[in-house]
Amino acid sequence: MVSGHRVGHDALLLAAFAPADRRTAVDLGTGVGSAGLAFLARVPEARATLVEIDPSLAVLAAENAALNSLDGRAQVVTADVATLGRPAGPDVPGKGAADLVLANPPFNADTRHRTSPDEARARAHMADADLLAEWVRAADRCLGAKGVLCLIHRPEALADILAALAKGFGAIEILPVHPRADRPAVRLLVRAVKGRRTPPALLPGLVLAGADGSPTPEAEAVLRDGGALR
């Protein structure tokens, strides 16, 4: 389990959904490094580049790496993910050779969601289909052949996610995350393979809490113990 600054559930779920046979990871929109570092903690043979646009968060990501004794396997890069997929985009270590990309794109683009009053937080929670497509292009540019992209997003964004993945990815697996068994999903975990054309598959959902509000064993295994999702 990774400790440190602001380790959130989304990042831990994302890291748990990544396959353990990956060795060269890029964590896009790393924030304070939670997803990339959680993956490194679970897969000791792996290395990761953590990419974050906000310099203050990038500093916290580096601090978290050191706090968890992962700084020897993690490199923090300050860059705008949306520019990485462009031909003249900035260079990122491992770009074109990574076998795993973790992506936590900004949420809440439309008027159904309130904008955060804090400008930095608002930037991290505002997105639209075009931005999501740019993130997928960035992942495509980072990955080598048959590399795996894992991302987490809102269920409402599923159509945009599938559209963005259609041009370069296949073997798409979708895992819904439910707060309780009788509640609609609040997150989707999506895994896709670069260059594959296998049809999508909907996986059995993950339920975070039982009827009494206590964490399910499956959720505890991931969020408390740093375990893997199927």
Regions found by a protein language model. Name each.
Residues 3, 7, 128-185:
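Conserved Class I SAM-dependent methyltransferase catalytic core
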Residues 23-31:
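Conserved class I S-adenosyl-L-methionine
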Residues 32-45:
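Conserved SAM-binding loop of SAM-dependent methyltransferases across substrates and taxa
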Residues 47-52:
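Conserved SAM-binding motif I beta-strand of class I
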Residues 61-62:
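Conserved SAM-binding loop
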Residues 70-81:
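Conserved SAM-binding strand-loop segment of SAM-dependent methyltransferases
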Residues 105-134:
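Mobile active-site "lid"/loop adjacent to the S-adenosyl-L-methionine
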Residues 184-230:
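SAM/dcSAM-binding transferase cores
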